Amino acid sequence: MNGNTGVVSGVRVSHETASLDELAAASAASTEAALDALLEQPPVEEAFVLQTCHRVEAYVVTADQASGRRALGGAGFNPAGGGAISMGHEDSLRHLLRVAAGLESLVVGEDQILGQLRDAYDAAKDAGGIDHVLREAVTKAMHVGERARTETAINEGATSLGTAAVRLAERKTQLADARAVVVGAGEMGALAAKAFASATVAEIVIANRTPARAVRVADMVSVPAEATTLADARGRLDAADVVVTATGSPEHVLPASAFADAGDTVVVDLAQPRDVAPGAGGHDGVAVHDLDDLEAVTAATRERREDAAREVEAMIETEFERLLTQYKRKRADEVIARMYESADRLKSREVQTAVHRLEAESGSLSADEREVVESMADALVSQLLAAPTKSLRDAAAEDDWSTIATALELFNPEFEDGMPFDASRGGDAASAESED
């Protein structure tokens, strides 16, 4: 990674922009594999991937926007793919804040996205994909998400897909004294199990690839619950009245044949890719619902949270401007640091020349005399650059990068790696939306 402040480019595919098939096609085999693919692209300095059951998002930091888009496409995140939305620097940053606040979730204000963001950040950090640009962006996003939930009512009521799935099932069948099966013992499965318990189902079977996690979830609920394996769960469907699936499996975990004798059963598949194989809904009495069918439940939640959402929107804009200011200050500081480095190199040469001349005329200088010469040179550099430093910071705050470019030409700093912004455009590379 270089010392320059780069540009964020992003691409997203979500429940709002794509069909479930398009979402499945955009999903990577794993977050780690996606990060590796992005970081293998030559221009990529940083990378971040967020992949949940209803969204796939990838972000990279590169020297310019065009390089970022090419890198995303080269790693399999095609900005022109089905349902994909390409994002420039500011759009990417604002979108991350909206995601963390829960405004982009299927269930507005849901809490699980914060944990998913933290996990994605940790994965990116472990892969070597996080430096100061994405660190500041994701940290700011999580800060906004926490503020939104503590300072507004954005997460009141049904606050997860797991809860929404149970609400949908409740509209389709009687849950009191029903027999429920939850497939997947992750956070979403646990929330679905708790929601079933609150709906006073008679019993819950919790299935997971690793039974120990299923046991932990079974111990959390207030109704009779049994933990089992995924393989065993297929034989429990005949007795089930309602099934919610939420695994992270890349393949179907419940074949259509498992529902052949299930009879009247409501199935809500929250997974992406789907847990339930196509054709399951063709059996008599079996009704399979997916993420698209949650709209009726989530729309009601969205309406109840409209006032809170407006408060969060205002909060996001304030924090977004603060984030941009952080980046602008960072870019200005990079230019200023290089200017001082250039001045220090010049100062060192001139001090050495002056000392040699003085010693040639008067003999060796004492340590105190040498210190006087060096202190005078330091003071001159500091005083001469104080006003330009303030002007450069003011110019950065106003996005006046042409002024900074002019100042650089006047001071002629000896940049070895180029400018940390695109001076040829007369503007900040981070806000430039260059075309391929």
Swiss-Prot record:
Keywords: NADP, Oxidoreductase, Porphyrin biosynthesis. The active site is at 53 (nucleophile). One of its GO terms (biological process) is protoporphyrinogen IX biosynthetic process. Pfam families: GlutR_dimer, GlutR_N, Shikimate_DH. The record marks 95 as: Important for activity. Catalyzes the NADPH-dependent reduction of glutamyl-tRNA(Glu) to glutamate 1-semialdehyde (GSA). Homodimer. Possesses an unusual extended V-shaped dimeric structure with each monomer consisting of three distinct domains arranged along a curved 'spinal' alpha-helix. The N-terminal catalytic domain specifically recognizes the glutamate moiety of the substrate. The second domain is the NADPH-binding domain, and the third C-terminal domain is responsible for dimerization. This is Glutamyl-tRNA reductase. The lineage of its organism: Archaea, Methanobacteriati, Methanobacteriota, Stenosarchaea group, Halobacteria. The gene is hemA.
